């Protein structure tokens, strides 16, 4: 019988955005900051590393970037498990564009082709496994009810994990947070400039409701997310603790909540027989490099010339 240690650790990193100098845009400081995070993680010596998406700067338009992202993750020397993010496979699906002129929201939609490219180049998802007495699962939640083949696969996965034997804890890895301001929040309007960022960052009400129902049936105790590049203190609702993760690349959305903090870093979780305890680790060094280039956000094709 395998002896389960009384205390052990895993880390959650997200939105690391490893870029390439061959691209039309590149921020070398972000890559440097990942190197800093990697050294800090090695010093902690966790048993697992969960990677919550956006491992490449532009995997959705330049999938060759995934190769380097995989190399730097392997170099940490900690077993890792990954799900995609929107910069890897595309944004949540919309049939309407916003009023923003710097992007085409419909053209940014996640597609089955991009999801399959991620599976081919990085790894399969969704997934679920037991480590010690904890079940870990990961899925790309934003495709729920999207009508894609991978969304149908997600439905099967959610039904299957709901039938598995219960575990002491069950950690679910997501990219998008399931909610922005409240678990019962209404639909945000993509065409309202005041609501656009909340629409962009969150999950719409109906898929959110179905995801939470499935998570509850599966005995999920913790949901880890990224995407917003801003952490908040863990929020527990109806037995599920929601953990909003920080980015190692760039801060954003830090002024949206009174308790929001967009300090760059990553999350460590210490597992004991009684609890999973959270600790934030800010980067010990943040790059001051100014030699990057290219536009931010989701530039239209004509803005992607190097």
Question: Can you name each region flagged by the protein language model?
Answer:
Residues 15, 53-54, 85-86, 175, ...:
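Active-site glycine-centered loops adjacent to acidic/histidine catalytic or metal-binding residues
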Residues 17-20, 88-90, 178-180:
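Feature marks short, surface-exposed loop/turn motifs that line or immediately flank catalytic pockets
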Residues 23-25, 92-98, 102-103, 182-187, ...:
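Short aromatic-enriched loop/helix-cap "lid" or pocket-rim segments at secondary-structure transitions
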Residues 1-5, 222, 267-306:
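A short C-terminal boundary segment appended to hydrolase-like catalytic domains
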Residues 7-20, 133-143, 171-173, 240-247, ...:
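Active-site-proximal beta-strand elements of phosphoester/diester hydrolases
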Residues 1-66:
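N-terminal active-site segment of His-dependent metallophosphoesterases
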Residues 2, 61-169, 195-198, 210, ...:
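Extended active-site neighborhood of metal-dependent phosphoesterases/phosphodiesterases
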Residues 37-48, 135-137, 146-241, 277, ...:
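His/acidic metal-ligating clusters that form di-metal
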């Amino acid at each position: 019988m395998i002896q389960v240690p009384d205390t052990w650790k895993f880390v959650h990193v997200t939105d690391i955005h490893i870029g390439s100098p061959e691209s039309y845009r590149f921020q070398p400081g972000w890559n440097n900051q990942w190197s800093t995070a990697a050294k800090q993680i090695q010093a902690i010596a966790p048993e697992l590393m969960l990677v919550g998406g956006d491992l490449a700067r532009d995997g959705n338009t330049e999938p060759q970037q995934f190769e380097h992202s995989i190399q730097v993750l392997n170099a940490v020397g900690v077993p890792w498990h990954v799900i995609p993010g929107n910069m890897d496979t595309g944004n949540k699906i919309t049939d309407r564009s916003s009023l923003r002129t710097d992007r085409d929201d419909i053209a940014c939609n996640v597609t089955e082709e991009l999801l399959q490219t991620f599976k081919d180049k990085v790894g399969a998802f969704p997934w679920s496994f037991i480590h010690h007495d904890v079940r870990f699962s990961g899925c790309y939640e934003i495709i729920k009810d999207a009508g894609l083949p991978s969304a149908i696969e997600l439905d099967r996965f959610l039904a299957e994990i709901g039938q598995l034997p219960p575990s002491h804890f069950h950690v679910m890895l997501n990219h998008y947070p399931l909610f922005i301001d409240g678990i019962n929040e209404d639909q945000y309007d993509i065409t309202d400039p005041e609501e656009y960022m909340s629409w962009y960052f969150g999950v719409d009400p109906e898929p959110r409701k179905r995801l939470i129902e499935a998570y509850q049936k599966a005995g999920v105790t913790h949901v880890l997310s990224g995407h917003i590049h801003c952490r908040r203190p863990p929020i527990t609702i109806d037995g599920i603790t929601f953990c909003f993760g920080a980015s190692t690349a760039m801060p954003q959305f830090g002024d949206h909540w009174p308790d929001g903090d967009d300090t760059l870093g990553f999350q460590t979780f210490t597992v004991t027989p009684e609890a999973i305890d959270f600790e934030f680790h800010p980067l010990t060094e943040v790059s001051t490099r100014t030699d990057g280039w290219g536009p931010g956000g989701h530039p239209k094709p004509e803005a992607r010339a190097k």
